[in-house]
Amino acid sequence: KAFNRDNPVMEVETEELRVCLVHPSVAYSGLSISLKKTPAVRRLKKEDMTGNGYCDARVIEFLIQCMAAHCSIAICGCSGSGKTELLKYLTQYIPAAERTVTIEDVLEIHYQKMNPNKDCVEMRVAENFSYTQAIQICMKQLPNWLILSESSPRR
């Protein structure tokens, strides 16, 4: 795909990296490049979260209890605040026998790689497969858990 005045945004991803380029024709301060690592590892650990001030131990215990009770959880926050990392941390509390379906537009959760012995269906939305379609199909997969990642406006 061309990257020029007519196509001023280029988004590229690899298995563990997301790259976004914005052309100088629309980024008047000059070419903008954004890199985001998306490794298939759990970077958050309970002791690190409490020790680094990420959150209080009671918050972590509350979230773990919410997972045990199959509560719906929405994780919101600013860019770079650790939403995906918190989600990856919480997935360890999903029982192996319970089917999980993930729906993402950019593959970042890596559920199957981080939980190789768990029942999982990973879906990716695309130009020809919308979030609406993915959710409709997901329900036919009989999930115990549905994980929706962030959605970009183009989807």
Residue ranges: model-predicted function:
Residues 2-69, 114:
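P-loop NTP-binding catalytic core
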Residues 26, 40, 80, 152-153:
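Short, glycine-/Ser/Thr-/acidic-enriched flexible segments
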Residues 70-79, 89-155:
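Switch/coupling sub-region of P-loop NTPases
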Residues 83:
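Conserved lysine of the Walker
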